[in-house]
């Protein structure tokens, strides 16, 4: 119970993540690994559990097997307490022979789950962002303002509005207009160059949500941002929750207390990793008072047999033999052989970097074998001929692309 209300959560975890290709070639976006031993979905699930929201349905669709296995291994809540569960829900075709047609449709097709739990409030959260949030504070705001629906909001630069739902509010914080990914938008009052954007996190009063979903479905509307929320602006009381007011315990003075990143592109995903590195990171992965949970790991600790390591994170089971690693994140069971150099890079699980190989500004997905002496990130044209390279020059080696 939060603010005297029972709460049910739906997590939108069915996204294809085409802008993260090739990392999403064999997995959904929420299942993409992040940092030392997490996956992107772990952030929203940790925020829900830390906020004492334990009734959680995870709605999946696109290439979901990797995500399903991760939830099975990592996210088992006690079955002894009623309404303590994290349940994966693939498309059930409850409304006919079709998959989920959008975010709102995925909840509409599972209205029977709401009827089963009978919560006072329903929270609908995305699964593809890196952040910490005490969701109880947003729920309290929803109750205190007598809202029908509440949208978590954050300021963004005007040049990014085409990637977000854009909100216009009155002086009391009531949403008067909602546009999904417009080409342009008016700046916030007294804040030139900045617009107010939806974070894709919502709180609904249950009866309002059920009615709005039913109405949207009857008109062919399948998406919260495109259809449901714009239609509700005039007919219902929609409030914007200022994410910058959210306070999570354990945040250090040097951290960005309002850190939130959409990691839906390769460049954004790459940059977010480096926000976790250094002596004073913008986002510290370690916070005992608000942990980001991950799968239990039985692997042995990392071993370094000489070499040079600076401002790096090494996962369990990593083996470094007289190699150089700078400003990089190395995930579990990676082997870095003698004379190899890794700089400004992310190397994922069970990859071997051969002797004398050099890697910089790259993302190496799981299960790769980098041959001895190979160079990645030093010749853009040569890299483009073999790998995916972003416009900013980040090289991505797909999962298992390079074999021994």
From Swiss-Prot:
InterPro entries: ADP-Glc_PPase (IPR011831), ADP_Glu_pyroP_CS (IPR005836), GlgC_bac (IPR023049), GlmU/GlgC-like_hexapep (IPR056818), NTP_transferase_dom (IPR005835), Nucleotide-diphossugar_trans (IPR029044), Trimer_LpxA-like_sf (IPR011004). Its EC number is 2.7.7.27. Keywords: ATP-binding, Carbohydrate metabolism, Glycogen biosynthesis, Glycogen metabolism, Nucleotide-binding, Nucleotidyltransferase, Transferase. GO terms for biological process: glycogen biosynthetic process. It holds the Pfam family Hexapep_GlmU. Homotetramer. This is Glucose-1-phosphate adenylyltransferase.
